[in-house]
């Protein structure tokens, strides 16, 4: 089967191949051509959960996060734990069940289990870990999770069910590096239960012994924290001895973030800082904090250089100016941009995603005006009526008709039609008289009408 060959997972494969690719296709169809002697050409048309551009953004963001985690040279356990902690602390579950891709996870920070497991796969692969995506059932729900290899044994990981996206929640390890016995509520699909699969991926008979971090040592309520400039957050200790308490909090770089004697951190400027807590019994715990600017507080202006955008059936992707306070931001450095379909009259949408020293999302809208009415003509004449017609436009709300009684006269609104009607009969006219008409399309947008340009003047005379 060509498709299964294309998505076959290899331990030395790239992070965008194998299970990652398989978890991101949504549909496909196959066509074949046997017109040539002894040769058949198969053409696969694939539909994916994300676009090529979105996958480029995923690669960029994953590298940025992994660089900040700085575990490339660490042992397998430390790498797996760093990925687990980042994903479970920063990504929320999508209870609307609409977001499924790694893009939704790493960029939108909201996704269902498929996005959790595929992002886990990509990040672990980039760190050189052996990892697979597993599907099956969690209780009665269809579900996706991972297995990863530490030394010579494989362990179960479910970052979806360990996710604790709340300000004061600490990291959960209930589903991290577990054996099958402690993962009994996860029932694998049959292809992951065969003897050949089990032979290729031998599961450890015991869960990883140091997996529950907070049961082993004193720690802070966050092991890593992502903040925006101006944000405030409170640290506190986990697993303190009864006769011990935190004596001091210190920041490795107060220019990036300061911390009070009570553990309250204030984000000052972009950068990375380590917060260290020391107890009276000289126990230490740290949290790595990454501070960025909040892109949602930026301003989008000069869309299309303030030139009116007119419908032409093509997707509109106008230029823009993005500023944060007095600084002009650069696409590809400070933000990436995606556009809505923007093919019809009405409201166009732009979405910016923070990059580099910026994080968050900024949305902007612009107006797409109907195009100029064309194809205007007179289709019927009587002594007291004139019937006009014109070419329909896609996506408009209707058409307005204007009339003048001389070539230099003032045009007056005389009537309108809906978007479904491209004819209009002007009645009660004077016999053997010449009239002049203009037509324009309009689009209702909230409480506003967006008008297209007037058609050419249509001159007509009654009988």
What are these regions, as identified by a protein language model?
Residues 153-219:
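His-Asp-centered catalytic microenvironments across diverse enzyme cores
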Residues 369-395, 431, 447-463:
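Pro/Thr/Ser/Gly-rich low-complexity, intrinsically disordered linker/stalk tracts
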Residues 400-431:
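Recognizes extended acidic, P/S/T-rich segments that occur
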Residues 115-183:
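Hydrophobic/aromatic-rich core segments of domains that either
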Residues 426-447:
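Beta-strand-rich modules
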Residues 50-105:
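Secondary-structure boundary elements
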Residues 215-297, 308-310, 314-347, 353-366:
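Extracytoplasmic soluble-region selector
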């Amino acid at each position: 089967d060509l498709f299964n060959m294309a998505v076959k997972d290899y331990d030395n494969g790239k992070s965008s191949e194998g299970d990652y690719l398989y978890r991101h296709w949504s549909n496909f169809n196959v066509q074949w051509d046997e017109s040539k002697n002894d040769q058949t050409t198969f053409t696969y048309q694939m539909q994916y959960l994300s676009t090529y551009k979105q996958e480029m953004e995923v690669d960029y963001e994953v590298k940025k996060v992994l660089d900040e985690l700085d575990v490339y040279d660490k042992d397998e356990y430390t790498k797996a734990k760093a990925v687990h902690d980042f994903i479970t602390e920063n990504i929320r579950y999508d209870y609307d069940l609409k977001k499924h891709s790694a893009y939704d996870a790493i960029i939108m920070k909201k996704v269902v289990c498929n996005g959790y497991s595929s992002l886990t796969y990509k990040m672990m692969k980039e760190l050189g870990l052996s990892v697979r995506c597993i599907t099956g059932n969690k209780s009665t729900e269809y579900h996706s999770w991972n297995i990863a290899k530490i030394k010579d044994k494989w362990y179960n990981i479910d970052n979806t069910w360990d996710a604790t996206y709340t300000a004061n929640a600490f990291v959960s390890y209930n589903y991290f590096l577990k054996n099958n016995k402690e993962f009994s509520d996860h029932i694998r699909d049959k292809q992951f239960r065969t003897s050949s699969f089990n032979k290729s991926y031998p599961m450890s008979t015991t869960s990883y012994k140091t997996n529950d971090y907070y049961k082993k040592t004193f720690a802070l309520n966050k092991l890593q924290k992502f903040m925006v400039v101006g944000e405030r957050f409170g640290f506190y200790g986990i697993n303190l001895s009864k006769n011990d308490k935190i004596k001091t909090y210190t920041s490795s770089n107060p220019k990036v973030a300061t911390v009070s004697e009570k553990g309250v951190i204030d984000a000052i400027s972009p950068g990375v800082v380590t917060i260290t807590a020391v107890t009276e019994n000289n126990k230490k715990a740290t949290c790595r904090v990454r501070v960025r600017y909040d892109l949602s507080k930026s301003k989008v202006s000069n869309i299309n250089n303030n030139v009116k955008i007119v419908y032409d059936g093509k997707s509109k992707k106008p230029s823009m100016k993005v500023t944060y306070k007095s600084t002009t931001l650069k696409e590809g450095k400070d933000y990436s941009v995606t556009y809505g379909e923007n093919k019809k009259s009405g409201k166009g949408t732009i979405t910016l995603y923070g990059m580099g020293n910026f994080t968050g999302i900024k949305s902007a809208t612009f107006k797409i005006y109907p195009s100029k009415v064309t194809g205007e003509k007179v289709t019927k004449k009587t002594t007291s009526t004139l019937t006009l017609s014109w070419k329909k436009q896609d996506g408009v709300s209707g058409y307005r008709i204007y009339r003048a009684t001389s070539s230099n006269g003032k045009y007056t609104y005389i009537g309108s039609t809906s978007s479904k009607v491209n004819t209009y009969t002007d009645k009660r006219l004077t016999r053997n008289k010449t009239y002049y008409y203009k037509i324009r399309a309009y689009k209702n947008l909230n409480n506003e009408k967006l008008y297209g340009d007037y058609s050419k003047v249509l001159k007509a005379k009654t009988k």
